[in-house]
Each structure stands twice: as structure tokens, then as C-alpha cells.
């Protein structure tokens, strides 16, 4: 029996700090073991939109706790993590830098690979978490200031 990889994913592209642990089942279907999200809606509400500097500061304040909670909720140990992935873009650069720096440092500390993830490509492939996809499929993606119509 092959060991299934355990990946720590980190998201900080805009106004949510998130961490998740994911693996796969025997059929190769992704299995989400934990998914912790901290929203910044209240932080930005009075400004009528996301303030990048405030968003980045909020990420810095919360990212360690969010990752810890994700690991605990997954029921796995930090030593079992095989790789760390973080959103690399598109997104707000000051926010992305928080997740990327944390993810790279975490991977380095564990002596594990680091994976930079394209935010839009991840959205495009996220249906695989709950569905068996038949390629090609039509994708309409609207995320923040980005939109795409594609055949995947």
C-alpha cells in the first residue's frame, strides 16, 4: 500500500487567512482533512472594501494560529506533512507575501518541498475535490478582480 501524500495548503491572497490539510483516498480522490478560515469582513467593513495593508497585518496576526488549528483538526501530526503549498498569485502582493513567507519557512523547517500555487488554477481544479471530472470541461471563473472562461 502506497503512502498517500499529506499537503498543508495556505491561502492569503486577499482578505481571508486559510489553512487546510489534504490527502487522497485509494481512488486518488482528494480528501480534505481540515479547512480553517479566518474572515476579515469586520476589519474592512467600515472602508467599503479591502484595505491591503490592514489585510496583510491581519494575515500576519492570524496565520500561525490558523495553521496550528488546521493541523490539530486534521488529526495528523506536523511530522506527517509531506509538502507545504501556498497561494502565489494572483492576489494582493502584500497579502500573498505573508502566506508565501510563512509557507516557505514552514516547509524549510520541516525539510519538505514547497509548492507555489496559482490561485486561479486552483479554483479551476477545485471541483475535483467533490466530483469525478471528465476532461475537457467548460470553466467560468469569477474571483475578486479576475475572471476567466476556459476549457480545462
Per-region residue spans from a language model:
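Short acidic/glycine-rich loops and adjacent helix/strand connectors
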Residues: 1-152
Amino acid at each position: 500500500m502506497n503512502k498517500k501524500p499529506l499537503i498543508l495548503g495556505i491561502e492569503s491572497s486577499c482578505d481571508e487567512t486559510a489553512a487546510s490539510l489534504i490527502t487522497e483516498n485509494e481512488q486518488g480522490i482528494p480528501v480534505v482533512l481540515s479547512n480553517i478560515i479566518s474572515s476579515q469582513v469586520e476589519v474592512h467593513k467600515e472602508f467599503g472594501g479591502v484595505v491591503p495593508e490592514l489585510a496583510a497585518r491581519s494575515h500576519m496576526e492570524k496565520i500561525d494560529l490558523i495553521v496550528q488549528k488546521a493541523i490539530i483538526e486534521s488529526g495528523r501530526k506536523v511530522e506527517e506533512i509531506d509538502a507545504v503549498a501556498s497561494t502565489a498569485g494572483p492576489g494582493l502582493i502584500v497579502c500573498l507575501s505573508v502566506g508565501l513567507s510563512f509557507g516557505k519557512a514552514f516547509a524549510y523547517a520541516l525539510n519538505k518541498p514547497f509548492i507555489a500555487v496559482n490561485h486561479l488554477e486552483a479554483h479551476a481544479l477545485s471541483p475535483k475535490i467533490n466530483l469525478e471530472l471528465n476532461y475537457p470541461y467548460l470553466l467560468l471563473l469569477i474571483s475578486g478582480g479576475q475572471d476567466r472562461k476556459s476549457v480545462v
